[in-house]
């Protein structure tokens, strides 16, 4: 039976090979391979027979079948019997030669089959193939292909056939006329030759070791003759390439004399092909093989052909490369291989050809030549060794080339030279210097490649050079003597600066190696190496470049490491000390990045290191030599200002350590004479140098400065006609600026006790002498801002130095007023609209220091100082801050800090309330400014002054703070300023003033007042710009002020605040109103006396103005009126036009002020709302089938009014009393307005209304009712309930017909959770509406009551029984929606009262089962609700109660498994799972049959297109599996079917079927037949899963179980699925057919 069965399976699959979907075709082939794995002979026979019978089958499909056969053969060639092999060989040979097309996939597939068979049945294959390879007849091209492939795949078995094949083939060559066939012959000859060469190379393993090359020589030469003399001249490019590809391996098989004879013609011919073919890989490869063959026979022809060879090969290397594809790269490698061959046989001729070409200016030629040179240096090292000097000298011109590609090639050649000892020869240093030069190239961004794709950025050259230098210095030991100490020469020249990092790294490595070798090798003999930098030059250079440590790839750390290693060569005393200090510097760099490092701190650390080094050396001669070297290197850093600045500091430090005054004076004078004054950074550096030097040499420093000012150099520059002489006016100003800065730094750095005596007599005199210019005896004020800035900065340093002196308190500074006046002139001269220079800041700082010195400033002078400084900073535009407090310019912040310091220093002179008031009065115009940024700045300064005053307050006697009210009145209204920062600062000012009052009352400074501390908590409320919160906070602030303000200050406070009513900032005006009202209320009777007058005024304002403070008065009036005429007011307001405008809404809210009045208003509104019908039905068209519901006006107006009254916070008490009635009425109002429209007149009115007084709320009837219900919840304190419903979108659901029930349920759930005690009266109120004539109201009340049962709170409130009775009474309601909700409510007991379910089990189960049979509709929503409810209740009822309904329920829900509606599938399957879970005891026997019957549907519906259904199947399967009592199956289910985890369905199904067939083999037939039902499923994925399920069952079943399966029926069904419109289904069907081989 096996063969017919396999044949049928195979034929069924093969019939589907023509499927249009490629994936299905692939699956068919895969299934065929599966059949072949089990039954290779039968499958191959079936395929062979199918192809013979279906002669007309298109060749693409025949190809696929042949490919499948090849796969089977490759895997099972050793299992194949001879007959099958024979049949396959005949078929494949026939298929291979059926078409005469060349290079066809079909032929290739057939040939591959023959090659696969030929690995074992070589003789049989050769017999059949050679039968089609007859002498005198041109063979089929595929025959040649197959022979060639056989020879490559099985050389040992094929080579013995080759002599006869070659002898037969030779005559055929001349018969071939078609170029395509000639190409095939060439390929065959190439493979034959390669096969022979492989055989000869492995003779020790060959079956016949006697085979010799001579055996093939004659035939190969005969073939060579045809190929070379006839075919190579063809016009067909493909043929020419095929010929040359064959000639390469053939040349190794030619007899030596023949090869020697042919080389003069062969080599030129092959070289000529370069001109005809763009793709040169095959040509170069064959040329290399030919050259190797020629060398092997010691051919003399090469000498003759060498020049032509070199020219052609050189041209190939120099040809522009279009891409970096593997083919192009391989072609280059083959050409270089040719050069290697030539270098080994003719090195002199090769170099004589190459080296002159290095002198060319052509970039490509030079780069190509360098590539060849590098290659032969590496690959022919022995032959090139004697040529090293010659090669080195020829590199002279390439070293001068500026082209980046040439540079890169040169670097690579030098790298190769270094590895082979070239650089040890004379002239090798030049190569090293070249590498260093390339390391010093600028590290630019990579450039975009040019049009030819060849351009390399300079950085790539640099990167290659850096890597080369490091590798050569660290890995090539023979280079140590070349590089050390030679590389040290490159440290100090500026042109090598960019190479310092790689240089230092290499030098560190070399130095450490030398140290290991011994001190003699490491210590440098400077006398013998004149070009090496001295220890002083090296120290200076490495220290200075370390000042910017992250520049140049981190040269700071590299330089310091080199400095540390070189300590013995710098000074013998430094080693031990540097071992301690140097690692600390390096660790500091490691801890920081370029962004986090403070350059100022780093420079200070380096200067400290230098001081420490100088102290350790303690040798004046060495120090003087070091200072001389430092001065000598100054010009080298003209292009790097920061490093030059640091070098100046180093010079100052070194001179400070020198003990020779003559050397110090000499160097200082030279520095002054040679400085580049026009550079600002150099001015600063020179000044720092003089300052540092003055620490130990003050007299000498001042003397040198004085001498220079008097010298001809300076006088010559400052004469009236200097513009025509040596220096321009600009240069003169720069020189003056620098000298002034020098004096400032000298004063700042020198010892304080020495400076004070020299300030007026020397330092200031000289500074102003430089600053003031006289022309013809007349003083001319300078206009140079830089000179001004230097003077101000220096005066600041001088002033600070004077103040910090121990004798400052007794020092009488005569020029104080003059200097302050000068500073004010500078400040007033600054532009008022911008902040560009730090002149303001520096001048104010100078004044701050000067204020402390004697004599004291006059009062008017102080006022002028304050006024000028305030105007200079306050009036700046806000852009000066750089934005709203974020990213402010540091200059602005520093300037404000300087102003604060100056004002507090002036306040310190008069620490009295009067003094504080004077300072605040200066700020007052700015505090009241119409410009917000000016107010914010002024408040900031005010806060600073008050804080300072409070911190330094000393009250010796109890005195009144007489101006407290005035000051508080100035700051308090600013608590509502439109600027947030101003509000915050204003509160801080009030806070400080209240504590100042407490201080004056005698309280200690650390006393904390609870009332005043409230201001800090209120400060947070001012962050929010919401006016309600803002003014409420202002009210609270006013309460605090009222409690702490002395009575005698109240009038002044009120008068001051009343002035703020007209403040340009409207917020402050409103805040003034709030504060006035609060103060009046808190203080007593004033408000009561003024109420009538105030209310009258505000009511009049209501018509004319929209100011917010008017409205409360009008509301109060309405309240008084309603207290006397409640019903009239309510009726009148209800008659207002809808929608209510904002004034009407406000008046409604006023009626909620007093609880008694509020209760009356609410009861009246409830009566009005229920008095009329909620809607009327009308038809838009007389013939319309559906009537529109239109809201009635009175209930609508009452609903809107209820919302306004309930919105008033004061209505809360009354709302709690009337809560049940309000809640029930509003909920039912919501229900009966769902879908209800406005009357047409109101719709049009609402569309037309554009009045600003109109309320923003929507007039929609349902929305109005929902708003009122929300207001009720909010007012009753049920904010949590309100938020809960909002989060679940319950309010939106309430307004829609589709979501209304869910919205009601969410409302009930949240009430049970957050407002449980209110449920009994609410439940009672709603129960009374159960008989409402409106169905929607019955639905709403039932939904609410049903949801309550899901909460446990009904037990606590004794509501369970009443609710059950109420709901069960509605089971016969005429509305299906009501009945459905009743079932939902009964099921809710599972979550709300699970412990009560057992007691009510029969009642609940009866209700649910009756729900399953509700109505005649097959998909009744009541039945769906019953299934969902049963799922929830099953785990909680008595098992006996369940047993009574178990079977009926299971049978009733089974049809829903395959329902078209997803909800029914989900609910029924999940209920099935719960039935399994709840099944106990005897039920298991009854239920096991149902489990087995449901297994297939559940597994297949895991592929259901709906996720909930698949999830339900996971649950049901996990519940079913225990009944099967199979641990392995249970483990698989729990592993794969975890909730939330995606199921790899194929893997899971495979595992499941494996366990099912192992433990339940008798179920095979039943499972397969059930699967057959789903072969016709309407869901594609389920339809695809069914055959897959079947396939896995078959895969894991034992062969003897096949009797359970109707194979005929199954195969027919699968055949039908192979015609399914869905490719995935066809694919699975094909896969399953492949598995049916199991039952063969």
Curated annotation (Swiss-Prot):
GO terms for cellular component: lysosomal membrane. One of its GO terms (molecular function) is membrane destabilizing activity. Its main location: membrane. It is found in: Lysosome membrane. InterPro entries: ARM-like, ARM-type_fold, HEAT_Maestro, HEAT_MROH2B-like, HEAT_type_2, Maestro-like_HEAT, Maestro_heat-like_prot, MROH2B-like_N_HEAT. HEAT repeats lie at residues 3-41, 218-256, 344-382, 385-423, 575-616, 1357-1395, 1398-1436, 1604-1640. Keywords: Lysosome, Membrane, Repeat. GO terms for biological process: lysosome fission. Lysosome fission factor. Recruited to lysosomes by RAB7 (RAB7A or RAB7B) at scission sites and homooligomerizes to mediate the constriction and scission of lysosomal tubules. May sever membranes by inserting amphipathic helices into one bilayer leaflet. Lysosome fission is required to maintain their steady-state number, shape, size, composition and function, and to accomplish regeneration. Homooligomer; homooligomerizes at lysosome scission sites. PANTHER family: MAESTRO HEAT-LIKE REPEAT-CONTAINING PROTEIN FAMILY MEMBER 1, MAESTRO-RELATED HEAT DOMAIN-CONTAINING. Belongs to the MROH1 family. This is Maestro heat-like repeat-containing protein family member 1. The lineage of its organism: Eukaryota, Metazoa, Chordata, Craniata, Vertebrata.
């Amino acid at each position: 039976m096996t063969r017919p069965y396999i044949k049928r399976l195979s034929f069924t699959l093969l019939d589907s090979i023509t499927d249009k979907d490629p994936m299905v075709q692939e699956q068919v082939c895969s299934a065929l391979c599966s059949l072949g794995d089990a039954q290779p002979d039968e499958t191959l026979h079936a395929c062979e027979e199918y192809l013979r019978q279906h002669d007309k089958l298109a060749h693409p499909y025949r190809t696929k079948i042949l490919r499948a056969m090849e796969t089977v053969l490759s895997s099972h060639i050793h299992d194949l019997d001879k007959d099958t092999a024979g049949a396959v060989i005949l078929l494949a040979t026939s298929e291979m030669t059926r078409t005469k097309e060349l290079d066809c996939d079909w032929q290739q597939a057939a040939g591959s089959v023959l090659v696969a068979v030929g690995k074992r049945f070589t003789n049989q294959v050769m017999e059949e193939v050679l039968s089609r390879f007859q002498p005198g007849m041109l063979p089929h091209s595929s025959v040649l292909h197959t022979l060639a492939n056989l020879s490559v795949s099985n050389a040992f078995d094929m080579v013995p056939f080759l002599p006869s094949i070659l002898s037969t083939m030779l005559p055929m060559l001349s018969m071939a006329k078609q170029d395509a066939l000639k190409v095939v012959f060439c390929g065959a000859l190439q493979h034959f030759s390669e096969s022979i060469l492989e055989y000869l190379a492995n003779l020790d393993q060959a079956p016949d070791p006697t085979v010799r090359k001579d055996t093939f020589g004659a035939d190969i030469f005969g073939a060579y003759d045809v190929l070379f003399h006839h075919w190579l001249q063809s016009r067909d490019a493909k043929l020419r390439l095929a010929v040359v590809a064959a000639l390469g391996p053939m040349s190794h098989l030619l007899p030596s004399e023949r090869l020697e004879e042919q080389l003069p013609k062969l080599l030129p011919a092959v070289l000529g092909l370069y001109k005809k073919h763009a793709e040169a890989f095959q040509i170069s490869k064959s040329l290399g093989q030919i050259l190797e063959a020629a060398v092997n026979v010691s051919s003399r022809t090469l000498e003759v052909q060498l020049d032509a060879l070199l020219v052609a090969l050189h041209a190939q290397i120099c040809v522009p490369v279009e891409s970096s594809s593997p083919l192009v790269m391989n072609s280059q490698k083959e050409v270089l291989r040719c050069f290697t061959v030539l270098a080994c046989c003719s090195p002199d001729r090769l170099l004589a050809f190459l080296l002159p070409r290095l002198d060319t200016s052509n970039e490509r030629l030079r780069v190509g030549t360098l590539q060849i040179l590098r290659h032969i240096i590496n690959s022919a090292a022995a032959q090139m060794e004697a040529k090293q000097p010659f090669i080195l000298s020829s590199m002279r011109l390439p070293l001068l080339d500026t082209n980046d590609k040439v540079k890169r090639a040169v670097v690579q050649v030098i790298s190769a030279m270094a590895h082979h000892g070239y650089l040890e020869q004379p002239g090798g240093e030049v190569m090293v210097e070249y590498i260093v030069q390339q390391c010093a190239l600028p590290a630019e961004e990579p450039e975009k490649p040019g049009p030819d794709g060849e351009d390399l950025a300079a950085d790539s050259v640099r990167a290659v050079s850096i890597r080369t230098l490091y590798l050569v210095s660290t890995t090539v030991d023979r280079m140590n003597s070349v590089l050390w100490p030679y590389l040290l020469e490159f440290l100090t020249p500026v042109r090598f600066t960019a190479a310092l990092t790689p240089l230092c790294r290499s030098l560190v490595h070399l130095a450490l190696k030398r140290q290991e070798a011994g001190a003699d090798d490491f210590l440098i003999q400077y006398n013998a190496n004149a070009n090496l930098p001295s220890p002083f030059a090296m120290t200076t250079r490495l220290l200075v470049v370390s000042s910017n440590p992250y520049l140049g790839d981190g040269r700071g750390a590299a330089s310091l490491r080199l400095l540390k290693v070189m300590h013995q060569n710098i000074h013998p005393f430094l080693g031990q000390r540097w071992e301690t200090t140097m690692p600390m510097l390096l660790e500091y760099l490691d801890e920081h990045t370029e962004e986090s490092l403070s350059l100022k701190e780093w420079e200070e650390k380096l200067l400290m290191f230098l001081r420490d080094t100088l102290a350790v050396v303690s040798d004046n001669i060495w120090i003087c030599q070091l200072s001389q070297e430092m001065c000598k290197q100054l010009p080298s850093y003209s292009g790097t200002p920061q490093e030059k600045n640091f070098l100046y500091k180093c010079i100052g430090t070194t001179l400070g350590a020198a003990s020779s005054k003559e050397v110090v004076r000499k160097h200082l004078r030279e520095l002054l004479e040679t400085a580049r004054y026009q550079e600002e950074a150099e001015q600063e550096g020179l000044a720092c140098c003089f300052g540092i030097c003055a620490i130990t040499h003050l007299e000498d420093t001042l003397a040198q400065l004085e001498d220079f000012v008097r010298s001809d150099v300076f006088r010559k520059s400052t004469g009236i006609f200097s513009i025509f002489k040596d220096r321009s006016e600009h240069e003169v100003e720069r020189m003056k600026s620098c000298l002034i800065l020098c004096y400032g730094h000298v004063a700042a750095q020198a010892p304080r006790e020495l400076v004070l005596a020299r300030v007026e007599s020397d330092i200031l005199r000289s500074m102003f002498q430089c600053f003031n210019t006289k022309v013809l005896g007349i003083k001319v004020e300078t206009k140079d801002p830089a000179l001004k800035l230097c003077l101000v900065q220096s005066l600041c340093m001088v002033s600070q130095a004077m103040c910090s002196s121990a004798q400052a308190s007794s020092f009488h500074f005569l020029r104080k007023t003059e200097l302050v006046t000068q500073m004010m002139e500078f400040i007033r001269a600054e532009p008022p609209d911008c902040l560009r220079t730090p002149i303001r800041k520096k001048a104010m700082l100078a004044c701050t220091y000067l204020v402390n010195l004697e004599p004291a400033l006059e009062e008017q002078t102080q006022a002028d100082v304050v006024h000028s400084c305030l105007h200079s900073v306050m009036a700046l535009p806000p852009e000066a801050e750089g934005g709203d407090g974020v990213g402010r310019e540091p200059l602005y912040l520093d300037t404000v800090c300087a102003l604060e310091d100056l004002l507090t220093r002036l306040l310190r002179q008069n620490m009295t309330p009067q003094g504080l008031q004077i300072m605040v009065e200066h700020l007052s115009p700015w505090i009241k400014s119409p410009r917000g940024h000016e107010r914010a700045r002024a408040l900031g300064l005010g806060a600073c002054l008050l804080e300072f005053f409070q911190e330094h307050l000393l009250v010796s006697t109890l005195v009144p703070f007489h101006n407290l009210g005035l000051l508080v009145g100035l700051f308090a209204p600013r608590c509502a300023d439109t600027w947030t920062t101003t509000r915050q600062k204003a509160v801080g000012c009030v806070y400080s003033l209240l504590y100042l009052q407490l201080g004056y009352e005698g309280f200690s400074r650390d006393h904390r007042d609870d009332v005043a501390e409230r201001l800090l908590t209120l400060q947070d409320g001012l962050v929010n710009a919401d006016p309600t919160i803002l003014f409420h906070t202002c009210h609270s602030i006013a309460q605090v002020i009222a409690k702490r303000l002395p009575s005698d200050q109240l009038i002044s406070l009120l008068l001051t605040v009343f002035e703020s009513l007209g403040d340009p900032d409207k917020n402050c005006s409103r805040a003034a109103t709030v504060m006035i009202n609060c103060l009046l209320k808190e203080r007593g009777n004033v408000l009561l006396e003024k109420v009538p007058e105030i209310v009258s005024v505000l009511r009049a304002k209501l018509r004319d103005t929209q100011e917010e403070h008017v409205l409360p008065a009008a509301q109060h009036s309405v309240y008084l009126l309603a207290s006397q005429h409640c019903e009239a007011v309510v009726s009148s307001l209800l008659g207002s036009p809808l929608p209510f405008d904002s004034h009407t809404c406000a008046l409604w809210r006023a009626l909620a002020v007093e609880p008694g009045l509020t209760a009356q208003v609410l009861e009246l509104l409830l009566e009005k709302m229920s008095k009329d019908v909620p809607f009327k039905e009308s038809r838009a068209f007389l013939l319309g089938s559906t009537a529109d519901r239109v809201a009635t006006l009175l209930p609508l107006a009452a609903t809107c009014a209820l919302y306004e009254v309930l919105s008033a916070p004061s209505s809360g008490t009354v709302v709690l009393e009337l809560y049940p009635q309000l809640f029930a009425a509003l909920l039912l109002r919501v229900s009966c307005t769902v879908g209800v429209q406005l009357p047409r007149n109101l719709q049009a009115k609402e569309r037309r209304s554009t009045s600003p007084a109109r309320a923003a709320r929507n007039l929609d009837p349902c929305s109005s009712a929902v708003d009122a219900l929300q207001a009720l919840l909010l007012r009753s304190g049920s904010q949590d309930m309100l938020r809960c419903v909002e989060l679940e979108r319950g309010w939106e659901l309430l307004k829609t017909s589709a979501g209304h029930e869910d919205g009601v349920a969410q409302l009930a759930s949240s009430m049970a959770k957050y407002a449980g005690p209110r449920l009994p009266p609410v439940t009672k109120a709603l129960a009374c509406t159960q008989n409402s004539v409106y169905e929607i109201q019955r639905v709403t009340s039932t939904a609410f009551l049903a949801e309550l049962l899901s909460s446990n709170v009904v037990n606590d409130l004794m509501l369970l029984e009443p609710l059950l009775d109420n709901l069960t009474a509605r089971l016969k309601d005429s509305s299906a929606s009501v009945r459905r909700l009743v079932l939902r409510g009964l099921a809710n007991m599972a979550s709300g009262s699970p412990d009560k379910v057992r007691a009510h089990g029969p009642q609940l189960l009866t209700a649910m089962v009756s729900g399953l049979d509700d109505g005649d509709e097959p998909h009744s929503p009541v039945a769906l609700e019953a299934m969902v409810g049963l799922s929830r209740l099953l785990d909680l009822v008595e098992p006996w109660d369940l047993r009574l309904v178990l079977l009926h329920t299971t049978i009733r829900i089974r049809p829903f498994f395959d329902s078209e509606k997803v909800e029914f599938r989900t609910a029924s399957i999940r209920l099935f799972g719960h039935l399994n879970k709840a099944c106990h005891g005897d039920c298991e026997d009854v239920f096991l049959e149902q489990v087995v019957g449901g297994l297939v549907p559940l597994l297949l519906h895991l592929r259901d297109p709906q996720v909930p259904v698949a999830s339900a199947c996971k649950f049901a399967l996990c519940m079913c599996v225990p009944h099967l009592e199979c641990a392995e199956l249970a483990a698989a289910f729990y592993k794969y079917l975890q909730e939330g985890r995606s199921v790899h369905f194929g893997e899971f199904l495979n595992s499941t079927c494996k366990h099912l067939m192992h433990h339940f083999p008798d179920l095979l037939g039943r499972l397969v037949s059930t699967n057959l039902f789903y072969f016709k499923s309407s869901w594609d994925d389920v339809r695809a899963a069914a055959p897959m399920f079947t396939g896995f069952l078959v895969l894991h079943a034992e062969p003897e179980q096949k009797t359970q399966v109707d194979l005929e029926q199954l195969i027919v069904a699968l055949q039908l699925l192979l015609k399914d419109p869905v490719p995935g289904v066809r694919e699975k069907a094909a896969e399953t057919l492949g598995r049916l081989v199991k039952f063969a």
